[in-house]
Amino acid sequence: MTALFGPRDAIDRAAALREAGASGVFTFEGPHDVFTPLTLASTVGDLDLMTNVAIAFPRNPIHLAHQAIDHQILSGGRFTLGLGTQIRTQIEKRFGADFDRPVARMSEFVAALRAIFAAWETGERLNFNGQYYRHTLMTPTFTPRDNPYGPPPIYVGA
């Protein structure tokens, strides 16, 4: 895996990295959106794609689940969702989000993602009720289709 940075050169950089023998590319939550360069890199071919890391707490699990599934589909099943907490100052002052009990919050965030993915895969009712997140509605209109790859692996940075 090799770092992929901004969106402007993501396609050319991903193609050059593939030509040089890289098996995949990753992005981090920095000066650009963590997903956009991966969306562009997915057009290059058989590269593995990974967020390293997407910051979880400013996002909602349902929103992130949609982004992850779309990248899993775009990459042909070669996407890995890397998540992290960031640090208190960044979460509270930059993103305006809560940072209390980060280990418990991250654990629940991942559990919510898995519950959402399972509802999409099985068609069973979504019923996730946690301390930080609650997801109890998933109608067919909002359920991704045409995903033969299943949910992506989830890695959590500490």
Please state what every model-predicted region is.
Residues 1-51, 147, 151-152:
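N-terminal beta1-alpha1-beta2 module of alpha/beta enzyme domains
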Residues 15, 36-39, 62-69, 73:
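N-terminal, well-ordered alpha-helical segments
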Residues 67-68, 73-158:
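Internal, glycine-rich beta/alpha segment that forms the wall or movable "lid"
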